[in-house]
């Protein structure tokens, strides 16, 4: 790909200034169009060391309103990358609707550094697959993000000139700002690697723009033109991904579950004390092993999620866990991709994040109530599995619970809540409306359980008509998970 670039083309200063008078106005207008259309934009600048990324980005900022975008460098994110899944830092830095985020080196730099740095240094850089990169970018573009990727290509001669010039100008500051792998030491070694990267991640939704950077004026004009063109086109023709075309299937998991499991109060109290003591000790061991945990609870209204969470957390040190109640997204959360609010709540190593309702709302309530378009919730199954796979690969232990009660038991609990002044706060008009849609929700839950049950993030269906049994099953499942992860860690 790179060998096809014409590195000899040049633009005079006069011609550059003439074109920038028009192009600068286009860039400013394009930014305003994106803001008005609430179109979030990510611009990635990659390329050889010595490429003029900083000068290019600075020139672009002069043409736009700096209040509308942020600039980040993955070189400076290395310190926080090891404590979270690879894309965690990038999810936290997503642009809000109508805003722009610019990357002066991005996830591509970190992947290259991991693969090309000396063996004793590559552990400083997190690893990621091309598949996860493509999935990440596709999730964003499917959700109306515009992702623009530029690779600034230099000849080996020009690269050496640029590096020498920068080193003389900035001295030690240049080395401190660029603690990166030094491509200049072996240009021929890095060239095929970059070719492979570009080929593997040049996709329809987020294609690479290859820029000849030996002449900086020519490079800037080409980059700015492509940015203005892309934004103008994106605003005129908003992305509208096709719906999932797979044949509809009927899933039936819940009908095989007998929600009635017997357990006396005496048996419950005896085992509850035993399980909670065990869990207290295991939490300490998980913290020592620095294993993060994500536990998600889903289930029918009045299925007992709150009670199960209380018995679980009663055994835990409050400094080591956080319960995240998930409701409808608020004003801030609506500015981002639906997964954003979960990526930003991931636990630190050794800590536990408990979600009362989860990311699966995308394929349940958002599906049934029409908050997500068909193509949005249909693709969410694969998006969620990819997200959970990334968490698991990072070492996060994942437990997912569906608390199952039958329709008659739910009605009994609803009536009990309405009759008890101390419990009336637990029942809402929305609960009754959801009950009227039982069959639709049941179909959605069945599909969710089948399509997102994986070895790394399996579903546990909890028979919930007997609250005592349900609470103990949750505790025992978490205990088993902790013991298994500790055994794997010690292998």
Residue ranges and their predicted role:
Residues 1-491:
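Glycine-rich phosphate-binding loop of ATP-dependent small-molecule kinases
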